[in-house]
Amino acid sequence: MPTLPRGLRFGSNGEVLNDFEALWFPERHTVDLSNGTCKLTGYITNLPGYSDIFPNKGVTAARTPYRSTVPVNHLGYRPVTTVEYIPDGTYVRLDGHVKFEGDLVNGSVDLTNFVISLAAQGGFDYQSVIGPRFSARFSAFSTKYGVLLGEGRETLKYLLLVVRRMREGYRAVRRGDLKRLRNVISTFEPSTIKGKRARAEFSQTYRDKLTGNKVEVRPSEGKWNSSSASDLWLEFRYGLMPLFYDIQSVMEDFMRVHKKIAKIQRFSAGHGKLETVSSRFYPDVHFSLEVTAVLQRRHRWGVIYQDTGSFATFNNGRLVPVKDWKTAAFALLNPAEVAWEVTPYSFVVDWFVNVGDMLEQMGQLYRHVDVVDGFDRKDIKLKSVSVRVLTNDVAHVASFQLRQAKLLHSYYSRVHTVAFPQISPQLDTEIRSVKHVIDSIALLTQRVKR
């Protein structure tokens, strides 16, 4: 048996146990650091040899000791430790040239090592965006069998509808009958009980007189409606595509049964978002700078795990092994998610509030995996900086030539965890997909028709 690095040991069954509790949750201590001095040199009206030097605002940061671990060679992973560096603001160093011309004051000044402090960097969390990817990864089955059964009747009707349309479309193309081809996508809407009976005797997808059926329908019993572009789009998005996905997921479930399980596996998912912060600063009495910075906030969650080959349910970020068939059957069907999925327009609500994601995470059946290590990592990067020069005088020219912008004391947090990201209620009003825009227009068109 190989020798393990300090902090690791073998358990009774030969498994590797991690004794890094002291490094998982180390104490943070506060440090005060200097950002040096800022230097201004150049020309300002009545001050030809202008020069000024002043200290920049210092930074206070909470940090943990920087520790690292030795990789476990025969297992292929490095145990995770907690490392954090959390400054009390967003400190950006600016080097550039300020130029302004006004009625009263003109100036041309070089700015060196001017450190500004914007809003604090921390305070963001994207677990609710990352969580659904974990739910999909560790789900016992790719197919939502409860939803499939709940929508089975409608799915079967739609499948038969597609088959009939394909058959009649083929016949129309072969005969060169464009009118009949157009009527392939027409639907009959009955208004009486007799009309419903008549609809059962012929296809709902094309006109009775064009198919050879002898069933006659009176206008009082119902009417034929031609499908619009919005009808066809919604039918494609929420009828045909889900049907294809269900077929694909059933095939994936079949292939997963024969998939070889590796001893140690990794999985991580992340999300990033751009945030804009701005503020005004006064390096000199003659002018001020309005600085706008675009920061990229990144959040990644990862786990190292072993697949046990059994099933589990989700409880507060952890997977709990299933001990009886009733619990497994309930999680497999997930009645709460089924009830939500069959609710009309529930998919529209999911665009703005993640109800479906929460019900899926809390109620579905999972593969039981033993998480041996993991991390919750957040960091911030500087994407861009823009600077605008402001003066008290009516300036004809006011410009800032940026030579360098650098993020100092950037936020970083990597916390050890063996849990999964927890999905919480989130209101999302951002437009994330062009498809959602088209869906919205199609739905509004449906409402106007009614």
From Swiss-Prot:
List UniProt keywords, sorted A-Z: Cytolysis, Host cell lysis by virus, Host-virus interaction, RNA-binding, Viral attachment to host adhesion receptor, Viral attachment to host cell, Viral attachment to host cell pilus, Viral release from host cell, Virion, Virus entry into host cell
Please name the InterPro entries in this protein's record: A_protein (IPR005563)
Q: Which GO terms describe its molecular function?
A: RNA binding
Pfam families, per database record: Phage_mat-A
- Localization in the cell: Virion
Key word RNA-binding present: yes
The cellular component terms of Gene Ontology attached to this UniProt record, alphabetical and capped at eight, are: virion component
Give me the ranges of the annotated region RNA-binding: 156-174, 255-265, 321-325
GO biological process terms held by the UniProt record: adhesion receptor-mediated virion attachment to host cell; killing of cells of another organism; virion attachment to host cell pilus
Q: What does this protein do?
A: Induces host cell lysis. Inhibits host MurA activity thereby blocking the synthesis of murein precursors necessary for the host cell wall biosynthesis. May be responsible for the attachment to the host pilus.
Complexes and interactors:
Interacts with host MurA; this interaction inhibits the first step in host cell wall synthesis. Interacts with the capsid protein dimers.
Q: Which family does it belong to?
A: Belongs to the Leviviricetes maturation protein family.
Q: What is this protein called?
A: Maturation protein A2
Q: Which organism is it from?
A: Enterobacteria phage SP
